[in-house]
Amino acid sequence: MKNILIVGLGRFGRHIAMQLNQLGHEIMAVDWKEERVDKVLPFVTNAQIGDSTNAEFLQSLGIGNYDICFVTIGGSFQNSLETTSLLKELGAQLVISRAERDVQEKFLLRNGADKVVYPEKQVAKWASIRYTDDHILDYMEVDASHAIFEVEVPEEWIGKTVGELDIRKRYNINILAVKNDGEFGIAISPDTYFEENHKLLVLGEYRALQKCFRI
């Protein structure tokens, strides 16, 4: 369980609060609008109404005590930038800030953000990959050049084993798990046998995955 601060309680911040609550974390939520704070009360441990660009207000929250500080302010990039910078100055361990454009990401990283999330860009990339190929069931970006895909087993792999196909050497990808009847099996060996109804969880570079699965 981690102690987490969320600054900015619009839709994105509210959804983060809900997910973190489901994961069992301690959450302090902050926004300058009372109605936004009221909406997250069922999902957070504590909440305060206040101006996150005010150093005294932030200091009163005990910033150094939080494992993660999320800056999810939308609508005012200036406020997001100031809040990010102040959090770092006040001893925040890890600051994760939201960007809406590429240029914002650069400024946030230069002014205290340890990491930047870009929801619109990330969702657009996910949707474009997920829904343009019928055999791609899910997708998660690992870094700029690697990803994890859930895919249907290629037709030419059916009836063969991992060892026969020599997947890692031939395609430079890793089979993380095989899904059968809704259950993922992670004990992958050279003798793992592919059947028609199998789904695969695979890790690799984008180019290798695109070539292997004809994405």
Feature roles, as predicted:
Residues 1-215:
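Cytosolic regulatory regions of ion transport systems
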